[in-house]
């Protein structure tokens, strides 16, 4: 009887699974047929000419946005952007540009070292007046950037107003494959402490980090600070490669698991480490996501590093690239990943998110405890919680306004033009600061201090309650003080 019961139960599972599969297939077939019928009917009957590309793209985006923020459709024309995301390379001249005003010229902000821009004499502050015969007036910074990019080996012609000589010259630049390194800085903080800032996880960043580590080791490094703040992640394979540098061969780094067959994977280190003894601090914040969290979580779970900063973003999802017809691609979430202790850093749901998308407060009752290699308690449910919490510096709203308005950058470029022959070791004097203040006052930018925002809100509430007349003198004095503070 027991055998018969087991057979009956097994058959029930098989039948129900098959029925579910058929139900899902029917739903997909029905949905596809309805969608195609709607498009055909619109094309035949709609009162105006049908913007097919626009409505199809809107439909695709709406469908994918209902799943998660990371599953996206990539049309053929955006493949170059995908390559930039994967390997941080593109075909171009190798320079950061800046456009202070839409009707002005685009300005070279920084030519990369060894880039075609630098080789052909483009300097910081040079104004690009024309690109291939087209004026940059009226073009956005992005439109100018797009015109500078192209297939390596092709050329682009610029009409340039040189910042130093004030001469207008024609320059023809041959585009090259530009690679932007993820290791943006590596140096010594003191005689024994090395510091490495890593901004991404594109191809071969583990090799870049290895080289930077060996260079600092040669300079006497005895302790390492690895800064992953603001690092939004990238390739999982590079995260595994970085952990491999600091833990014994064969150590578990991360595992992934999804619903589809073949998505459960376990990733261990496969090479001999560089150094398993050097003390490491990993710096993180709410901008540290994905592969950054894999590295941080693994080094924390293996008790190989001390994590400092603020809680990480909380993106524990794995994306894969799938080819689509007409050279399009689908970046689709296929699995969740888990640290060596078994934690998933993905936020429990999207309701526990801050405005910037990072994980918000989650009560311990909704999370689970896990143990590190040495028995320390860590928790899941959203991001990696640092061993030592250190809040970042909170800049004033005025500072943010000046930075994001471009006023500081614009003044710096003007300063370069006026002081083209300045020594490399120059220092800003008080008169330079006064010049910046005067320059900023000539620019219109949106700035309201937090205090002014709260004051206006309080004043409205007092007016509603009929109390503002009794406090008019105090309110006027406070408003005057706030205006003086803004000045």
Question: Residue locations for each model-derived region?
Answer:
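PDZ/PDZ-like peptide-tail recognition elements
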Residues: 70-110
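Conserved functional hotspot residues or short segments at active or partner-binding sites
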Residues: 344-351, 355-487
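N-terminal, post-signal-peptide region of Sec/Tat-exported proteins
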Residues: 47-82
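Polar, glycine-rich mid-to-C-terminal structural blocks
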Residues: 291, 303-304, 310, 314-373, ...
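Bacterial Sec-dependent N-terminal signal peptides
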Residues: 1-26
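Cleft-lining beta-strand/loop regions that shape enzyme active-site pockets
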Residues: 20-31, 35-52, 75, 107-111, ...
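Residue-level recognition of conserved beta-strand edge/terminus positions
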Residues: 131-132, 381
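Structural motif
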Residues: 125-127
């Amino acid at each position: 009887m027991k055998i018969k019961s087991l057979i009956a139960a097994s058959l029930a599972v098989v039948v129900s699974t098959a029925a579910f599969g058929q139900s899902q297939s029917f739903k997909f077939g029905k949905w596809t047929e309805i969608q195609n019928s709607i498009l055909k009917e619109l094309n035949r009957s709609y009162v105006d000419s049908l913007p097919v590309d626009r409505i199809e793209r809107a439909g695709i985006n709406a469908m994918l946005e209902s799943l998660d923020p990371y599953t996206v459709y990539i049309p053929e024309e955006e493949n170059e952007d995908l390559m930039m995301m994967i390997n941080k390379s593109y075909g171009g001249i190798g320079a950061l540009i800046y456009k202070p005003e839409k009707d002005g010229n685009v300005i070279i902000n920084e030519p990369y070292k060894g880039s075609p821009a630098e080789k052909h004499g483009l300097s910081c502050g040079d104004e690009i007046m024309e690109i291939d015969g087209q004026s940059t007036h009226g073009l956005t910074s992005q439109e100018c950037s797009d015109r500078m990019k192209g297939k390596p080996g092709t050329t682009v012609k610029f009409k340039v107003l040189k910042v130093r000589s004030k001469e207008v010259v024609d320059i023809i630049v041959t585009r090259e494959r530009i690679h932007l390194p993820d290791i943006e800085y590596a140096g010594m903080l003191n005689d024994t402490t090395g510091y490495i800032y890593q901004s991404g996880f594109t191809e071969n960043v583990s090799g870049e980090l290895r080289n930077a580590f060996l260079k600092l080791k040669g300079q006497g490094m005895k302790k390492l600070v690895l800064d992953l703040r603001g690092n939004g992640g990238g390739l999982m394979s590079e995260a595994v490669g970085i952990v491999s540098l600091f833990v014994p061969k064969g150590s578990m780094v991360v595992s992934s698991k999804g619903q589809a067959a073949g998505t459960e994977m376990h990733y261990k280190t496969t090479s001999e480490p560089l150094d398993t003894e050097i003390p490491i601090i990993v710096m993180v914040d709410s901008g540290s996501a994905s592969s950054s969290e894999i590295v941080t979580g693994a080094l924390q779970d293996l008790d190989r590093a001390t994590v400092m900063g603020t809680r990480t973003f909380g993106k524990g999802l794995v994306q894969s690239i799938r080819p689509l017809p007409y050279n399009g691609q689908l970046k689709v979430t296929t699995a969740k990943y888990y640290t060596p202790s078994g934690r998933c850093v993905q936020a429990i749901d999207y309701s526990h998110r801050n405005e910037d998308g990072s994980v918000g407060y989650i009560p311990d009752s909704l999370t689970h405890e896990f143990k590190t290699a040495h028995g320390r308690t860590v928790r899941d449910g959203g991001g990696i919680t640092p061993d030592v919490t250190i809040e970042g510096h909170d800049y004033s709203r005025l500072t943010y306004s000046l930075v994001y308005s471009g006023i500081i950058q614009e003044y710096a470029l003007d300063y370069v033009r006026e002081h083209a022959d300045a020594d490399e070791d120059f220092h800003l004097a008080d008169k330079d600061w006064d010049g910046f203040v005067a320059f900023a006052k000539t620019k219109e930018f949106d700035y309201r201090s937090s205090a002014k925002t709260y004051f206006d809100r309080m004043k409205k509430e007092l007016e509603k309650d009929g109390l503002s007349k009794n406090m008019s003198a105090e309110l006027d004095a406070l408003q005057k003080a706030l205006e003086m503070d803004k000045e």
